[in-house]
Amino acid sequence: MSTETLTLIKNSIKSIPDYPKAGIMFRDVTSLMEDPKAYQATIQSLVEKYKQGGFTKIVGTEARGFLFGAPLALELGVGFVPVRKPGKLPRPTIAQTYDLEYGTDTLEIHTDAIVEGDKVLVVDDLLATGGTIEATVKLIRQLGGEVEHAAFVINLPEIGGETRLEGLGLNVYSICEFAGH
């Protein structure tokens, strides 16, 4: 990816101070999607990175993972699988609970969405703690999928999610990084 493309993408992401609470600098990818050139450059950079990966499925985690994972899946000519919060998927599912800063949350995937031997790429908008993606990876592996790669638009390296995911055997890629929380 060229420096010009990276600058376009990074500059299109708005930073919102003290959201959702004081001391947090929220990185808003919806502003990136409002700019068609930046959005297209983001998807194309992921296509270039993963077009030779041999993936059979792209999995996106609710909700912003859908916005990058689905167009990537179309470009790669593979299926897209959403991982959602409980009660949002109509067919039989399996669930994985994970820890949040204050409490827990749960994610679900259709039991027939991943088959034994599927080579899966996980996509989300932002990597912070890695908890959501860890739960997603556990769901995929429980269904027999092979997942060794996770891609993000943004990484917040100071929070430690990349190290956490590498501990699960994942190769982690992010288009850009921002300092802080």
Curated annotation (Swiss-Prot):
UniProt-listed CDD domains: PRTases_typeI
Question: Where does this one sit in the cell?
Answer: Cytoplasm
Q: In which pathway does it act?
A: Purine metabolism; AMP biosynthesis via salvage pathway; AMP from adenine: step 1/1
Q: Which InterPro entries match?
A: Ade_phspho_trans, PRibTrfase_dom, PRTase-like, UPRTase/APRTase
* Enzyme category, top tier: transferase
UniProt-recorded Gene Ontology molecular function terms: adenine binding; adenine phosphoribosyltransferase activity; AMP binding
Record's keyword annotation contains Glycosyltransferase: yes
Q: Which GO terms describe its cellular component?
A: cytoplasm
Q: Which Pfam families match?
A: Pribosyltran
Q: Which UniProt keywords apply?
A: Cytoplasm, Glycosyltransferase, Purine salvage, Transferase
What's the main place this protein lives? cytoplasm
Q: Which GO terms describe its biological process?
A: adenine salvage; AMP salvage; purine ribonucleoside salvage
Q: Which reaction does it catalyse?
A: AMP + diphosphate = 5-phospho-alpha-D-ribose 1-diphosphate + adenine
Q: In the Enzyme Commission scheme, what number(s) does this protein have?
A: 2.4.2.7
Q: What does this protein do?
A: Catalyzes a salvage reaction resulting in the formation of AMP, that is energically less costly than de novo synthesis.
What is known about its subunit structure? Answer: Homodimer.
What family does the Swiss-Prot or TrEMBL record give for this protein?
A: Belongs to the purine/pyrimidine phosphoribosyltransferase family.
Q: What is this protein called?
A: Adenine phosphoribosyltransferase
- Give the organism the record lists: Aliivibrio fischeri (strain ATCC 700601 / ES114) (Vibrio fischeri)
Question: What high-level taxonomic lineage is stated for the organism?
Answer: Bacteria, Pseudomonadati, Pseudomonadota, Gammaproteobacteria, Vibrionales
- Its gene is apt
